[in-house]
């Protein structure tokens, strides 16, 4: 059995490699870092760690329950019959922290920069809109309930953002930021880029996500260095995209 713990929306790609019948999808709420071989720094305590696992066909199987037992040693773990909806919900959450990746800051530091929280919420609203248009049923992740999400309405992205920043811990650094620090290609093209790609197919404008992808490309190519001042480049890129 292959349990994909990646952030991006890629269970179908995993299925192409190892066979659909061998794949179990998973969603993760946990911050950790690996900068030295064999040493994992965990930034989220067990009480704030959450997983959801699900079969791609939506069935609740015995092997799924076995995986759940294993993951309960690490944190909370729920079973889901809506793994695609759950994965898109996590993609929404990840899309909102990806704007931090070029700032060389921890998540809590980045979100305090003037305008950054509102920008991230704008990213999330686009991601929610595209997911809804694709027909995905949004899952109440991170300990939230269906009622929480439903009552929030258009402010659901803001609710998820606040909950996520609170739970992951003060030392959390977004996954894409770690990739940039290591000089690796980040997952942003498969997260925000996925939102942009699906948005274009559906005729939905996604300037916030588009801006995040563009800044990530500039960072990876070396056109800009990791620095908090990149927030100004990000905001300027958004203005250009909206104007165009």
Predicted regions and their residues:
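Active-site-proximal catalytic alpha-helix in oxidoreductases
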Residues: 84-130
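Beta-strand-loop-alpha-helix segment that lines the small-molecule cofactor/substrate pocket
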Residues: 1
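Short, contiguous strand/loop micro-motifs
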Residues: 54, 114-115, 182-183
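Short, solvent-exposed coil/turn linker segments
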Residues: 19, 82, 97-99, 106-109, ...
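Rossmann-fold dinucleotide-binding core
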Residues: 5-96, 101
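NAD(P)-dependent Rossmann-like dehydrogenase/reductase catalytic/cofactor-binding core
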Residues: 121-244
């Amino acid at each position: 059995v292959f349990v994909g713990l990646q952030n991006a929306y890629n269970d179908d790609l995993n299925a192409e490699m190892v066979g659909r019948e061998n794949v179990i999808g998973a969603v993760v709420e946990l911050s950790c870092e690996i900068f030295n071989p064999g040493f994992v720094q965990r930034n989220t305590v067990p009480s704030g760690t959450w997983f959801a696992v699900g079969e791609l066909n939506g069935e609740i199987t015995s092997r799924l329950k076995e995986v759940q037992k294993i993951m309960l040693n690490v944190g909370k773990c729920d079973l889901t019959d809506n793994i695609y909806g759950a994965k898109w919900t996590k993609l929404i959450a990840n899309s909102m922290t990806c704007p931090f990746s070029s700032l060389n800051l921890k998540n809590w530091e980045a979100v305090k920069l003037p305008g950054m929280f509102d920008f991230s919420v704008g990213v999330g609203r686009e991601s929610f809109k595209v997911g809804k248009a694709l027909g995905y049923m949004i899952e109440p992740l991170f300990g939230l309930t269906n009622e929480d999400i439903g009552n929030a309405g258009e402010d659901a992205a803001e609710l998820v953002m606040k909950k996520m920043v609170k739970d992951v811990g003060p030392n959390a650094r977004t996954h894409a930021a770690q990739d940039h620090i290591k000089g690796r290609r980040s997952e942003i093209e498969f997260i925000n880029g996925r939102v942009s790609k699906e948005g274009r197919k559906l005729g939905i404008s996604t300037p916030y996500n588009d801006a995040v992808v563009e800044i990530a490309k500039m960072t990876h190519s070396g056109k800009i260095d990791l620095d908090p001042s990149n927030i100004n480049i990000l905001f300027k890129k958004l203005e250009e995209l909206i104007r165009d």
